[in-house]
Amino acid sequence: INDVLVNTSNVQGFVKYSVTSKLGNCAGGTTEYIVRVNPLPKPDLIDGHICVNESTGVTYQAYVLDAQLADPNFTYDWFMLNTVTNTYDALPSANGSTYEATQPGTYQVTVTNTVTNCKQTDQATVITVYPAIAFTSIVTEAFTNDATITITVNPVGTGSLIYSLDGGAWQNSNIFTGVEAGTHQITVEDTEGCTHLTETVEVIDYPKYFTPNGDGIHDYWKIVGLEAKHNAKIYIFDRYGKLIKQIDPLGDGWDGKYNGQNIPSTDYWFKVDYTENNQQKQFKAHFSLKR
């Protein structure tokens, strides 16, 4: 009799096997065997990715494969799938519970218990992720507290991009709506951790009033968010249409004076000619001077 007893349940501990020999309808004697069932190592590799500069091919962020075992009686042998021969090649000097992968591919670890000689293998796949390189922001609906910022990433990379406004919650959409006037920070990342880009964006608006009384608070009237690229010209008028002041859009603003003299508290009108997304635009409105 020559047979192999296989324990398919993987029950740990001691197992009793009863073996009865038979020949035709004739049964022989029964022999009992006590077999010790040792636990198998249970490596648990997790699929991951490496970050690679697409233009240079250089890996700038490796991925650490972890067998997630710490038994001092375990040894580790690491392999990588050779896609030409479809066999696993041993990775030299890779004998720890972790391995730092710098190339994409399928990896395998064989863990051996040196006391019981039980061994188990596990595999994981490591893929390449190329980062996004840069992005541009387009602001529409200026002069409102309901502006829209649209983000365009180029090159987009291969990661799953997410977007954040002013350090707020991450979102999958590249469009932010209802954005208030002022300076904002846009952050673009990917969920794989290969991309991290930031940029400041200005949303244009104007203060509805100012109080030029020298207390350092709202002493100047100035349009918020204008930059040199807007090529803006700002004109301030009184209620009769008389030009009071032309102000520098990048300067401090208007101090509430005409020819060096304070002028009355009342409403004043302004006109701003500017460029938004390569289109010439004009905006008119009024604000209050309060003393």
Q: Where would I find each of the regions flagged by the language model?
A:
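Short loop/turn motifs at secondary-structure boundaries
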Residues: 198-291
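Solvent-exposed loop segments of extracellular immunoglobulin-like
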Residues: 68-82, 86, 156-167, 230
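A short beta-strand segment in extracellular, disulfide-stabilized domains
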Residues: 55-70, 145-155, 219-224
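Proline-enriched interdomain boundary motifs that mark the N-terminal boundary
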Residues: 40-48, 131-138, 204-208
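Short, exposed coil/turn segments at beta-strand boundaries within extracellular/luminal domains
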Residues: 24-30, 114-123, 168-170, 191-200, ...
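Short beta-strand segments within Ig-like beta-sandwich modules, predominantly Fibronectin type-III
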Residues: 87-95, 165-178, 246-250
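Solvent-exposed segments in extracellular or luminal domains encompassing
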Residues: 1-16, 95-107, 174-183, 252-253
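Conserved structural position at the C-terminal beta-strand
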Residues: 21, 111-113, 188-190, 272-274
